[in-house]
Amino acid sequence: MKNKNSEQNTHSTIGEQDIHYFHEGKHIYAYEFMGAHKACEEGIEGIRFTTWAPNAKSICVIGDFNYWQVEDKNYMEPITDAGLWSVFIPNAKNGDKYKFVVTNKDTNHYVYKSDPYAFFSELRPNTASIITTETQYTWSDDKWLEKRAKTNYYDNPMNVYELHLASWKTKNGKFLTYDELSETLPQYIKEMGYTHVEFMPLHEHPLDASWGYQPTGFYSVNSRHGDIIGLKRLVDKLHNNDIGVILDWVPGHFCKDQHGLIYFDGSPCYEYQEPTKAINKGWGTHNFDLGRNEVKCFLISNAMYWINEFHIDGLRVDAVSNILYLNYDREDGQWIPNIYGGHENLEGIAFLKELNGVLKHTCKGVITIAEESSSWPDISTPVEKGGLGFDFKWNMGWMNDTLRYISLDPVYRKYHHNLITFSMVYHYSEKFILSISHDEVVHGKKSLINKMWGDLWNKYAGLRLYMSYMIGHPGKKLIFMGSEFVQFVEWREYEQLQWQVVDQYESHKQTLHFFKKLNDFYHNETALWQCDYNHHGFRWIDADNSQQSILSFIRSSKDNKQKLIFICNFTPVTYYDYHLGVPDAGSYKEVFNSDNLEFGGSGQVMATEIFSSLQSSHGFEQRITIKIPPMATLVLKLIK
């Protein structure tokens, strides 16, 4: 089995070792010989096509090179009894469109299929695969990759900007190309202070409204924005601006459009044989058979493909619950228990462990993130310690609780105080990322600003309060595009964000400025990210002040030299002469205040130093007396 770290092979030899590892489910570079590859055989140049279809009677390759005619010379030959087929076509070349005509051995019914391993495809609604052999790119991100391999992300800042390429910005109503995005996106993300961008799926998908989560071409770069080289240039540019690239990846299920993976050889192939496991009624898709060796090769090789060929720094694995549970989104009687009588998908569990094990062993510094909403234990525990092996898990519980809390009238917040504090009860059980993702601003859930309580002033203040509370809470961060400049309408995948409001309204400009300052503050303060997953990094001052809806806590660096005190006031009331216990005697200074005038707040700031006094409060021997602005987060720092 080959083990390479960069560009694709340009020869077609399929060795016995490759075949063996493929059928054993252990090949992690299957894309090097599966699909369409440039070849020179007996001195003749052409393309070798290879696919897997165990229940096929015959497979013919049709395309531009043979006028889309079924011809004897273009039929594939079986090269194993387990379903590998291959053919060399001399006059096929880079840029030619093609499909497979697959005839089932039991029914003689034939279907026209796109190549599962195609590197590029036609723009929807067309569905042909495109021979793509000219993919070489000279990267300039060596320094980034060297740094990535040495980085421990647990004790470094991670502030992720989640992005849907098609609707971030457009040009005259049309999609921006990868090259056009390279001119603006890296600079914007860098200026705003985000450390990573997370792209929603970039593999080919037929329906725009699926946002990429119902893919057909797992190896095929989204053709709406250009070609492979363009995407590589975009990633390279991001890396050269010190921005990591995370990709949403969908290994659990696939689109059921007829040209795709569904019943690829006329029978269940990539999906489970058992319909109750294969058919995903909730999403209208089919679930991958994660216990089948060749399917595991397809998926793990796909992860390796994006990481090796496009220098992707992390995979956010979508819908992990659908992989873990046999009864996910199914009523009683709609699922079959495992061999032990449980609802756990044993094959899915084994697949996730194998995936994470492979990536840890072969891809230094690459992270995996689980989008998972259940209480499944040890998701971010290493495989060798009994876990699934992810590096991080989205904290869906924190997101649901806090968004519910922030939407309440402050009069009633004291009765629901646990919603804003409960997350710290379980925080150290996983390596959590606090995520406010695309899922929270669609389908009638309202935009982030419209989740806030009150009139316009209180909505803006509530947003600043909430985001600065989020920055102070342990865990890495993720925010969806548009929230940073206060898009009032829900996200719409069919049009660009409402960037015009930044120029039209001062409040939007001020909030964009607030996000930039908040991100810079986060990045510059070691205490906010160095001990996210260590009890030393967080301590409550007062978690129980439900009557006034005020939270106060301490964030600390590893060496304890940096301490930040957060005070979050979730009411529109200014509190004067508020006594707060502090851990150290000395002078404290306000270092961040979400109520600052420059952010659109009321300007209730403390410009002078605050000195502690030897009076006990909140379990500390020292206390300070401060003014707490309305609907705001105040951050203090010990300076001497």
From Swiss-Prot:
CDD domains xrefs: AmyAc_Glg_BE, E_set_GBE_prok_N
Catalytically driven reaction(s): Transfers a segment of a (1->4)-alpha-D-glucan chain to a primary hydroxy group in a similar glucan chain
GO molecular function, one term: cation binding
Annotated catalytic residues: 318, 371
SUPFAM superfamilies referenced in this protein's UniProt entry, alphabetically: (Trans)glycosidases (SSF51445), E set domains (SSF81296), Glycosyl hydrolase domain (SSF51011)
EC numbers, comma separated: 2.4.1.18
Annotated Gene Ontology cellular component terms: cytosol
Keyword Zinc among record annotations: no
Pfam short name (any one): CBM_48
Keywords: Carbohydrate metabolism, Glycogen biosynthesis, Glycogen metabolism, Glycosyltransferase, Transferase
Hydrolase listed as a keyword: no
GO biological process, one term: glycogen biosynthetic process
EC class (word): transferase
Pathways involved: Glycan biosynthesis; glycogen biosynthesis
Coiled-coil regions listed in the entry: none
Superkingdom assignment: Bacteria
Family affiliation: Belongs to the glycosyl hydrolase 13 family. GlgB subfamily.
Subunit structure: Monomer.
Function: Catalyzes the formation of the alpha-1,6-glucosidic linkages in glycogen by scission of a 1,4-alpha-linked oligosaccharide from growing alpha-1,4-glucan chains and the subsequent attachment of the oligosaccharide to the alpha-1,6 position.
Name by which UniProt lists this protein: 1,4-alpha-glucan branching enzyme GlgB
